[in-house]
């Protein structure tokens, strides 16, 4: 009888582990603010979704005001869209692999930026990043290299 109860207990634990495991391992949702008329912004959103992220995209008339509300005041960091994930700000065409690395390492940063609109970046003219840098920035908006492609 006790052996039978142990077996049922093990089975129940396994079932619940498989059922709720993905909920705990899922990546946080990325919230994106972008212009409705910007095709590369939508392609970056699509790229992130294809890479497994859940993305909530907001079309806004003034993306710069969103950047400022989030605390990005240095125009040198700006790109065409702004995102927030896991407490970090993502500015521009940052590759999904860099976002995952940021979320896994949890550095004391404000976020990542791919300033401007790098031509060979996800959402622009390439899925594989080439020929540009992704910078990390702190609350003082001082930058240093995060990744180079």
What is each of the regions a protein language model found here?
Residues 35, 61-66, 117-118, 124-126:
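Mature soluble domains of exported/periplasmic/lumenal proteins and thiol-rich metal-chelating peptides
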């Amino acid at each position: 009888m006790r052996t039978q109860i142990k077996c049922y207990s093990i089975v129940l634990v396994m079932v619940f582990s498989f059922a709720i495991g993905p909920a705990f391992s899922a990546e946080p949702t990325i919230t994106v603010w972008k212009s409705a008329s910007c095709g590369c912004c939508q392609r970056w959103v699509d790229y992130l979704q294809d890479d497994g992220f859940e993305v909530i995209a907001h079309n806004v008339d003034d993306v710069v005001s969103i950047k400022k509300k989030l605390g990005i005041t240095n125009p040198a960091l700006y790109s065409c869209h702004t995102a927030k994930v896991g407490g970090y700000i993502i500015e521009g065409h940052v590759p999904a692999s860099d976002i995952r690395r940021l979320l896994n390492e949890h550095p004391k940063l404000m976020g990542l930026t791919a300033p401007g609109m790098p031509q060979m970046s996800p959402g622009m003219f390439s899925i594989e990043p080439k020929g540009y840098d992704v910078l990390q920035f702190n609350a003082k908006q001082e930058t240093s290299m995060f990744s180079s492609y």
